[in-house]
């Protein structure tokens, strides 16, 4: 058996073990213990030409919405984004993401799954699927820190003249991926500092060509000012490396006004 086939076999076994473990524990969660929900709607704009690198992509208007629900046994989070609203329909793009942590053996270890889809009328469409394991044990009054590791399966419409489509195994998302939140008060005003970060490793050849690198970085650092009970203003430093169709490191600044519910 070739090394490539052995790798595919190992990946398949890991997926099967992960799914079987999650399914095995699902009957125990037929009556979930509800903890709470959260969500928000936001509107604003992103400036690709500010930040540390001028990517020469201009300013884009955007709207976003997110919703999450937490149980003792599992957590679910979803996100929607519509971009480039100041351009004609042909130049707009839309993003939908759904993510979950399901606790294993009543512990802080979790089955982790994420589906991320992007539909772009001018560049291309892709659907990314991550599955692996996470951890929910790091949280407190200071906020939370939720790492996860996983395999990456990708489906896209990019076709390389040399390597073919990007579809199929697309490497890994490994240990240095997190979501963190830190609430604090300054001058009697409430703020929240949050960060998400993903590093993609060992991409397939076609996706490597499309994104200009075998590995890639994708993330955002946000500070939100809770200036009224349900209203907030936020600034995000969005950073990426060999991602979003950009060769090398790039960034943008995002300015949003939002309503929490």
Residue ranges and their predicted role:
Residues 1-36:
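Cleavable N-terminal export/targeting peptides
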Residues 29-83:
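Short glycine/proline- and aromatic-enriched beta-strand/turn motifs that initiate or cap beta-hairpins
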Residues 42, 56-59, 82-177, 211, ...:
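Outer-membrane pore/translocation modules
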Residues 73-78, 104-111, 140-145, 182-194, ...:
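Repeated loop/turn-to-beta-strand initiation elements of outer-membrane beta-barrel proteins
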Residues 152-230, 239, 259-261:
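Outer-membrane beta-barrel transmembrane domain signature
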């Amino acid at each position: 058996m070739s090394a490539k086939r052995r790798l595919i076999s190992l990946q398949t076994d890991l997926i099967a073990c992960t799914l079987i473990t999650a399914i095995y524990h699902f009957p125990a969660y037929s009556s979930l213990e509800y903890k709470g929900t959260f969500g928000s709607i936001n509107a604003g704009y992103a400036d690709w030409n500010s930040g540390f690198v001028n990517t020469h992509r201009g300013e884009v208007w955007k709207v976003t919405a997110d919703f999450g629900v937490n149980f003792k046994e599992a957590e679910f989070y979803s996100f929607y984004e519509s971009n480039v609203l100041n351009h004609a329909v042909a130049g707009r793009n839309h993003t939908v993401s759904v993510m979950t942590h399901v606790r294993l053996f009543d512990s802080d270890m979790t089955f982790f799954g994420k589906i991320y889809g992007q539909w772009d009328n001018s560049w291309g469409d892709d659907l990314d699927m991550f599955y692996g394991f996470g951890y929910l044990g790091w949280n407190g009054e200071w906020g939370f820190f939720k790492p996860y590791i996983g395999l990456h399966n990708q489906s896209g419409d990019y076709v390389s003249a040399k390597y073919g489509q990007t579809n199929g195994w697309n490497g890994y998302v490994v240990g240095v991926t997190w979501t963190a939140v830190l609430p604090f008060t300054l001058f009697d005003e409430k703020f929240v500092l949050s960060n998400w970060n993903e590093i993609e490793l060992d991409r397939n050849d076609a996706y490597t060509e499309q994104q200009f690198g075998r590995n890639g970085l994708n993330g955002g650092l946000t500070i939100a000012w809770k200036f009224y009970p349900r209203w907030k203003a936020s600034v995000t430093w969005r950073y990426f490396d060999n991602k979003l169709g950009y060769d090398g490191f790039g960034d943008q600044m995002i300015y949003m006004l939002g309503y929490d519910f």
